[in-house]
Amino acid sequence: MANIKSQVKRIRTNEAARLRNQSVKSSLRTAIRSFREAAAAGDKDKANELLVATSRKLDKAASKGVIHANQAANKKSALAQAVNKI
């Protein structure tokens, strides 16, 4: 355990941020998985709906610093390509 007051606070804030980031990443994975399932089923309307929702989640995660902006862009591009293949 840290002895310095600021270190104790950093430990608390880092843990809170870790849990928050973990939650955001989990919801991202779930959104991407549900999109891929719709795309694999060939349901273009549902895939387009989920593409918008997933892109929004990716952008929010990137703006909050949970994932890198380039990673969000690459994932959005791959999802858009998957929709266009249907």
Curated annotation (Swiss-Prot):
It holds the Pfam family Ribosomal_S20p. The keyword rRNA-binding applies. It comes from the Bacteria. GO terms for biological process: translation. Gene3D superfamilies: Ribosomal protein S20. The keyword rRNA-binding applies. One of its GO terms (cellular component) is cytosol. One of its GO terms (molecular function) is small ribosomal subunit rRNA binding. Keywords: Ribonucleoprotein, Ribosomal protein, RNA-binding, rRNA-binding. Binds directly to 16S ribosomal RNA. Belongs to the bacterial ribosomal protein bS20 family. NCBIfam families: S20. This is Small ribosomal subunit protein bS20. It comes from Rhodococcus opacus (strain B4). The lineage of its organism: Bacteria, Bacillati, Actinomycetota, Actinomycetes, Mycobacteriales. The gene is rpsT.
